[in-house]
Amino acid sequence: GGAFAVFYLTVAIAFHYYHIFSQTMAFIILIGVTVFMSVLSVVYNRRELAIISLVGGFLAPFIVSSGEGSYLVLFTYVSILNLGMFGLSIYKKWGELPMISFVFTWLIMGIFLLFSYTSSSTVISGHLFLFTTLFYFIFLLPVFSILRGEDMRTKSRGLVFVIITNNFIYLLSGALF
């Protein structure tokens, strides 16, 4: 896991300081590292590697950011990352992945809303509402998965947290947009 963190840092330095890669190439390299780490986590059954991969995946757009990126690209990438996380969490039954993804996704959305969003554009508001709707349904998928499982007693607190928080955030975004 630590070697991959160093690799993320190496790509960031190569992009920002030495301009060895273009922004697109650096981002593609980081996506490749994230996918490779996810595959290794499945092959070696290493939950902690999947967590590092997920966190690295969420940090990748910011590692190669020049401050002028598209919110559409960012939230599309986050949506794809969340769907991949959901597939991995179902396949390996790693319930903490959706929780980590949930926190990072809404944190990224919240930071974007605080620092980059202006309500003057109805097009941007429409896009953001579509993404919050997509995120809402993505984070309902693990809930349905848990409900289908046998051992719900151990997961009930996390389930209640996700349901309440997800509904509250979606309600808030509906009022905002």
Regions found by a protein language model. Name each.
Residues 1-177:
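Alpha-helical multi-pass membrane segments and their bilayer interfacial helix-loop junctions
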